[in-house]
């Protein structure tokens, strides 16, 4: 007989809170959660708005958003009934559509967009990745006051770029409830990316629950929706493969750290339905093609909370654009992208059908559609990959072979004596004792606006890790003292899957950097949080307690982001390009949204050529809402 009592000390003591009986009675079968309804979607069509606004509809795909093109646009934000899971709900929609209509612009034109608010609360539209005057950026409290109920706001700006972008609300939880759509900008000159046809593929996620209730549950228990917790069966499987001692030690370590090795995403398929162009997996969005054509697929991650891993079994993907900017073509089998990012890929289908498969990073579900020669066809849908545990490199960066590189602020002291748990007066990094990063004399952290290293090298980011005093407190559950700086890691779940996976190191912007100057100074910020308390911040300071980050107008500044958490954060700076650097300081790629992996330290250059007030935040909506947000002032 096996005595299972010792297993209670190995991470099996947590019990999910019991749901109220009124809610439990409405729980859906897992298949319904993952697949959704075959006909699930917006119940109120766009016909009324189409007649009023002259909306055209694409005729080469089924389930695609309507398309508006030109220079004058009228958008109305209101509510529409939807049903993705069998439970009718109200969504927040644009012109009665989810996703919102695709907007097609032309580089060099001046566009005018009138946005009417038919909600009972304020709303807004942010033009994600678009370079424009800050007054047109659409962030309430930063660039304008928002659009009050019943009011109309007119956005007007010149289009200075081309490529694939998107737009979404920046008010409350409206992005999560449906206010998002694609933007396609035709270049002023001939497009160097040649294709016979194209499809916009916008991925998103949907929850039947009120997003504020979801957030309240996460505040109660940070891993509330994590249904991939280690089980007794997993323990015995690991013991047989790795040995009993290794299996026990691994679980003991995680349990003493009070962290979950499988907490890759805040929300899972147990509360989310994954959508492709507003269509459930069972609904099967379909993009048409003729065999032998070169097809351009414009992928947009418009999800509020989901990283997607995208592949099309049977087809190679040639990545030609990232965040709307052309890159040197790179052929892969798969790519990962987070909320806010976009990728354009070319494919050349030969057969009748292919599945467009986008599995969530935590492997609890997927979005899917079909490329087909005619409507009604479908191809085999792959099984989701097995979920993986976070690796040591995801916790400690460059110190992945030992435990000296991470500081847990009081937890796991007995098991990991090489870590500093004594009140965080200094820094423990296995041989760097005596370096006091609690006082850091000479650095000004009073404003919590990031560390300014004005004297640093112009050619390469500094390598010394500096933690602000504000990182030493209850709102922080870990600090990484020796982060990894490599860009060639595809991330957890993709490292050894047998497929060629895109990494940041593969991306090289055509034409090089926009600004040849080196950095005049450095600003370092740490991405911080406490997963158990579900709080997120920069340098341990939530947005409501922070002061702005200041850029001097016209300067070339290097920004260093250091991820002191075990989650990947897609970081989005409004109004200016982020020019990603390789570890050796060379230019890599121009981005508007950069994913920063756990225990990773990245750097990018910014030319502060956009006067005004701008937002800078994690694009995981709940992280942003809980404090991982800063204002940037360019003056």
Per-region residue spans from a language model:
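N-terminal twin-arginine translocation
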Residues: 22, 26-32, 41-62, 635
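Histidine- and aromatic-enriched segments that form or immediately flank copper-ligand environments
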Residues: 2-6, 68-194, 266-271, 298, ...
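Histidine- and aromatic-rich segments of cupredoxin/plastocyanin-like copper-binding domains
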Residues: 136-139, 145-148, 248-408, 453-475, ...
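N-terminal secretory signal peptides
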Residues: 1-29, 39
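Extracytoplasmic/periplasmic copper-protein system
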Residues: 63-65, 180-204, 368-405, 627-635
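Mobile cap/lid helix-loop segments that border enzyme active or cofactor-binding sites
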Residues: 88, 203-290
């Amino acid at each position: 007989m096996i005595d299972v009592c010792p297993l209670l000390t190995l991470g099996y003591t947590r019990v999910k809170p019991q749901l109220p009986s009124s809610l439990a009675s409405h729980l859906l079968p897992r298949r319904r959660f993952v697949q959704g309804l075959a006909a699930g979607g917006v119940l109120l069509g766009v016909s009324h708005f189409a007649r009023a606004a002259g909306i055209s509809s694409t005729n080469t795909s089924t389930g695609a958003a309507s398309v508006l093109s030109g220079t004058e646009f009228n958008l109305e934000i209101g509510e529409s009934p939807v049903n993705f899971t069998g439970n009718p709900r109200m969504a927040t929609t644009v012109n009665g559509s989810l996703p919102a209509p695709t907007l097609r612009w032309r580089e060099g034109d001046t566009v005018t967009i009138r946005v009417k608010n038919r909600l009972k609360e304020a709303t807004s539209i942010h033009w994600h990745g678009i370079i424009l005057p800050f007054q047109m950026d659409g962030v309430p409290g930063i660039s304008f006051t928002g659009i009050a109920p019943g009011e109309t706001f007119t956005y007007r700006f010149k289009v200075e770029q081309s490529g694939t972008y998107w737009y979404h609300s920046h008010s409350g939880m409206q992005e999560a409830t449906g206010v998002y759509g694609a933007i396609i900008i035709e270049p002023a000159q001939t497009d160097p990316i040649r294709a016979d046809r194209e499809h916009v593929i916008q991925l998103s996620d949907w929850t039947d629950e009120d997003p504020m209730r979801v957030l309240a549950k996460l505040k109660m228990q940070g891993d509330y929706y994590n249904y991939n917790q280690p089980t007794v069966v997993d323990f015995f499987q690991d013991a047989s493969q790795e040995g009993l001692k290794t299996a026990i030690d691994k679980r003991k370590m995680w349990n003493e750290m009070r962290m979950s090795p499988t907490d890759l995403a805040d929300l899972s398929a147990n509360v989310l339905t994954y959508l492709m162009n507003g269509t459930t997996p069972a609904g099967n969005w379909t993009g048409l093609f003729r065999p032998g054509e070169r097809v351009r697929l414009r992928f947009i991650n418009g999800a509020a909370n989901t990283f997607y891993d995208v592949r099309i079994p049977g087809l190679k993907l040639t990545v030609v654009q990232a965040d709307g900017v052309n890159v040197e073509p790179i052929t892969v089998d798969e790519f990962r992208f987070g909320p806010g990012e976009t990728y354009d890929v070319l494919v050349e289908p030969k057969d009748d059908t292919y599945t467009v498969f986008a599995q969530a990073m935590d492997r609890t579900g997927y979005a899917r559609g079909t490329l087909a020669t005619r409507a009604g066809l479908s191809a085999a849908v792959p099984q989701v990959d097995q979920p993986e545990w976070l690796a040591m490199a995801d916790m400690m960066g460059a110190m992945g072979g030992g435990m000296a590189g991470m500081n847990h602020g009081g937890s796991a002291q007995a098991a990991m004596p090489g870590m500093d748990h004594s009140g965080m007066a200094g820094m423990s990094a296995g041989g760097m004792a005596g370096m006091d990063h609690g006082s850091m004399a000479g650095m000004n952290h009073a404003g919590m606006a990031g560390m300014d290293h004005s004297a640093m090298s112009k050619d390469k980011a500094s390598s010394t890790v500096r933690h602000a005093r504000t990182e030493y407190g209850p709102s922080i559950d870990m600090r990484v003292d020796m982060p990894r700086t490599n860009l060639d890691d595809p991330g957890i779940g993709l490292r050894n899957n047998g497929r060629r996976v895109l990494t940041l190191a593969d991306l090289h912007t055509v034409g090089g950097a926009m600004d040849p100057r080196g950095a005049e100074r450095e600003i370092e910020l740490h991405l911080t949080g406490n997963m158990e308390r579900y709080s997120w911040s920069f340098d341990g300071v939530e947005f409501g307690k922070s002061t702005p980050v200041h850029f001097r107008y016209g300067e070339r500044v290097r920004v260093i982001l250091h991820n002191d958490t075990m989650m990947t954060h897609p970081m989005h700076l409004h109004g200016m390009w982020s020019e990603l650097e390789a570890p050796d300081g060379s230019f890599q790629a121009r981005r508007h949204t950069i994913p920063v992996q756990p225990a990773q330290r990245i750097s990018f250059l910014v030319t502060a050529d956009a006067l005004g007030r701008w937002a800078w935040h994690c694009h995981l909506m709940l992280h942003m809402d809980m404090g991982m947000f800063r204002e940037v002032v360019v003056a």
